[in-house]
């Protein structure tokens, strides 16, 4: 015992051993999804569409779970034109029975379920003083309840079939209590998305014993159709004053970070959490917002570096 305890550890040999055990990146990023089956809620548009695209690019078989048939058919046409193996199941994630039906469809069609991404979401702009109960319920049912029970349905299948799968919940930068500057008006949406973050942590604590990785991505503003429809509804409710404040947000700022990003910027991170890259991640929420929530310096201030304000000072 004493001899073993006192034995000198060779750091170079340990490093070589670790390197030998490491999986090649080709296997992690390219080959890891081949033959895998993924279910993506809200996969017919926005972030979900880009997640489906990335999973298919890695040769996964993907099922889109969404409500609207017309939009889903257009998405299927896009993906199948590229030779991707994709199908659609009509799903209203606010209904628990639909969540379970989506998992049943996926496992019946493809014989497995390895990855779940819950990107279906609903939101709009209402002042806390104005929010109707039915709008609150709709957002909570889709954003929070839908993620919870779709995740439960997927997890039950994975546990029963001893699948060490990946579950990725989608939250939002709103979970930090942030909203459009000068406007806000998304308290109920923020509450739902904060719930998704808490759910990720606690559900992960239960499912890790089965080898299931549960993590979350919290995107900032993205250029999706929902951004424009949500704005139209708010303009009608609150008039030109709302539009003026919204339009002035960020105007005149030299900050190169866009207020809204291509959803593929987020989809790439979601994809990574679906791969062996996330094998040692449990219950984490990854913020992907381009730094838009940071306290940012709006001018390149420096008195030592040329090209900044005020620039190098003369030696005294």
PLM feature spans:
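Short C-terminal tail/terminal secondary-structure segment
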Residues: 4-28, 271, 282-316
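Conserved glycine-rich cofactor-binding loop
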Residues: 37, 44-45
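Short, small/polar-rich loop/turn modules that mediate ligand/substrate recognition or access, typified
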Residues: 117, 208, 213, 281-283
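Substrate-binding pocket helix/loop in short-chain dehydrogenase/reductase
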Residues: 127-128, 132-140
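A short, exposed helix-loop element centered on a Lys and neighboring polar residues
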Residues: 151-152, 201
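Catalytic loop of short-chain dehydrogenase/reductase
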Residues: 159, 168-195, 200-209, 221-223
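A glycine/serine/threonine-rich, flexible loop-to-helix segment
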Residues: 182-183, 221-254, 265, 295-316
């Amino acid at each position: 015992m004493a001899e073993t305890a006192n034995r000198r550890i060779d750091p170079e040999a340990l490093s070589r051993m670790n390197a030998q055990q490491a999986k090649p990146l080709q296997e992690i990023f390219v080959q890891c999804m081949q033959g895998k089956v993924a279910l993506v809620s809200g996969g017919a548009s926005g972030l979900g569409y880009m997640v489906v695209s990335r999973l298919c690019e890695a040769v996964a078989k993907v099922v889109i779970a969404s409500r609207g048939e017309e939009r889903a058919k257009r998405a299927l046409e896009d993906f199948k034109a590229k030779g991707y193996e994709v199908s659609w199941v009509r799903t209203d994630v606010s209904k628990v029975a639909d969540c379970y039906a989506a998992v049943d469809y996926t496992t019946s069609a493809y014989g497995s379920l390895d990855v779940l991404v819950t990107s279906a979401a609903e939101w709009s702009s209402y002042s806390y003083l104005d929010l109707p109960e039915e709008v609150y319920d709709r957002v909570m049912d889709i954003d929070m309840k839908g993620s919870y029970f779709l995740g439960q349905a997927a997890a039950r299948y994975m546990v029963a079939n001893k699948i060490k799968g990946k579950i990725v919940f989608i939250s939002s930068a709103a979970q930090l209590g942030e909203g459009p500057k000068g406007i806000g008006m998304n308290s109920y949406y923020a509450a739902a998305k904060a719930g998704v973050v808490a759910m990720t942590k606690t559900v992960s604590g239960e499912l890790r014993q089965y080898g299931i990785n549960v993590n979350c991505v919290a995107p900032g503003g993205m250029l999706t159709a929902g951004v424009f429809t949500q704005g139209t509804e708010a303009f009608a409710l609150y008039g030109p004053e709302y539009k003026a404040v919204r339009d002035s947000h960020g105007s005149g700022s030299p900050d190169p970070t866009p207020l809204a990003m291509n959803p593929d910027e987020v989809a790439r991170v979601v994809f990574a959490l679906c791969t062996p890259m996330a094998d040692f991640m449990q219950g984490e929420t990854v913020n992907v917002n381009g730094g838009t929530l940071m306290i940012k310096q709006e001018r390149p201030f420096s008195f030592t570096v040329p090209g900044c304000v005020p620039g190098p000072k003369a030696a005294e």
